[in-house]
């Protein structure tokens, strides 16, 4: 950790930088049990505060989450975009000069400039909260806190042995499916929209459709950017995932990469649940960190594992 900026209520913002031990002593001097911690993208800052320094406040708050629910995609969620929208100041660019640097790489002058940059970020975040938080529903602040805690203070334990066994099973099933495809299905069948649609129907899945912008007529939604086709990559039937992966030329299915990701996490500890508050215009949560915890299979052998 290079340093941190901290503001208590409307007092002056402090910049702190030092060894891990010095930073721990500094943070231990605050009454977190009776405090709310605010940041912009608190999932990131909160994880560092909790995982490295044991900070566990009464409430976590996040101006990024609040902004998504207020502005959607109309303004932008970055601190820079929001600060310009509310005309409260300008976000600095010193962080770009610090990419790849450790604390010991900074000169005294560089560290001082970086501290000023951090202080400015804190002031902008505080001002944003003052502007957006006045009429913000308290019950939604509680929802934001609960959402953040699922990542910052993880409690879900993963069964490493079961996951490793599941990964072997998934890969075996994929190999068998691809062998069966190779016996009766060629690359041209996978790339032909009509024949690929027939393969999907053979698995009991109706192919997704869309209106072609070129012809104005209905056609199959098999482009890799089509929402319906992307949904097939996350289909609860593994056979569908494997079929789509084969068409795309991918070596791994979503089930494989997701299971491997869970295995890597299990070796480190509990599962932080990375979901974003108000990720869509409907207000629903969205997945993050390449793990959509909301889209795990619920039926079949995969549903018993994931």
Go through each PLM region and give its residues.
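Active-site-proximal helix-loop-helix substrate-binding element of RNase H-like nuclease domains
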Residues: 3-6, 10-24, 30-133, 140, ...
